[in-house]
C-alpha cells in the first residue's frame, strides 16, 4: 500500500493527480506485474521514506521503481509494470504517446529475485478461499485494488505470523470488477 501511495503522491506533485487523470483525461493506470523484495520487516505505524520514479518504458509499458527506507536503511525495493488505458475506448496507450517528462526518472532498481518464473506443472493446488469483490476492496476503476491481492494471499498462509516474507511476484492477468468472484489457490511448499 505504501508503494502505491507513493506513486499517487508523485503524480500529484509532479504532474496530474490520479483522480484528475481518470475523471478528466479518461485514462487509467492498470498494473500488470509487481515484483517486491523485502530485506527487513516494517511494522505497522513505522516511520518510513519511500522513493519512487518512472523507468523509461517501451510499447505500452509504464514501469515504476520503488525503494523504501526505515531509519535511513533500505528495507524494500520493487518494480511494477503498468499499462495506461483509455477508459473510453479501452485501448492501451503507448508510452511514446503519453508525456511523462515532468516525472522523476531513473533506471530500474536491481532485484535479486527473478521477475519471471514458471510454476512447476506437478504442483497440486487446492482452493482455500472463494469470495466476492466488495466495495471496501475496489479502486477508482471499480476493480479490486492491486494491493488487496497480496493481502488475500498473505491471509491464506497457514501460521503466517511465523514467517518473514522476503519477496512477492504478482502477475495480474484479469481485472476483478466489483461483485465478481475471485478464488485463492495454494500448494504445499517445495524445495
PLM regions and their residue ranges:
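Terminal targeting signals and extreme-terminal segments of soluble enzymes
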Residues: 1-51, 55-191
Amino acid at each position: 500500500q505504501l508503494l502505491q501511495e507513493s506513486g499517487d503522491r508523485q503524480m500529484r506533485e509532479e504532474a496530474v493527480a490520479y483522480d484528475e487523470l481518470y475523471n478528466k483525461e479518461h485514462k487509467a493506470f492498470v498494473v500488470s506485474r509487481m515484483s517486491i523484495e523485502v530485506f527487513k520487516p516494517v511494522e505497522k505505524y513505522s516511520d518510513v521514506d519511500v522513493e519512487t520514479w518512472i523507468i523509461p518504458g517501451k510499447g505500452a509499458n509504464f514501469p515504476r521503481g520503488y525503494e523504501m527506507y526505515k531509519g535511513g536503511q533500505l528495507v524494500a525495493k520493487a518494480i511494477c509494470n503498468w499499462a495506461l488505458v483509455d477508459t473510453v475506448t479501452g485501448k492501451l496507450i503507448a508510452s511514446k504517446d503519453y508525456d511523462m517528462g515532468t516525472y522523476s526518472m531513473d533506471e530500474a532498481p536491481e532485484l535479486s529475485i527473478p521477475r519471471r518464473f514458471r510454476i512447476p506443472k506437478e504442483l497440486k493446488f487446492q482452493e482455500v478461499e472463494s469470495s466476492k469483490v466488495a466495495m471496501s476492496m475496489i479502486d477508482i476503476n471499480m476493480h479490486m485494488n492491486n494491493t488487496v491481492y497480496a493481502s488475500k494471499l498473505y491471509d491464506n498462509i497457514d501460521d503466517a505470523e511465523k514467517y518473514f516474507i522476503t519477496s512477492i511476484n504478482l502477475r495480474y492477468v484479469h481485472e476483478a470488477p466489483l461483485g465478481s468472484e475471485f478464488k485463492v489457490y495454494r500448494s504445499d511448499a517445495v524445495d
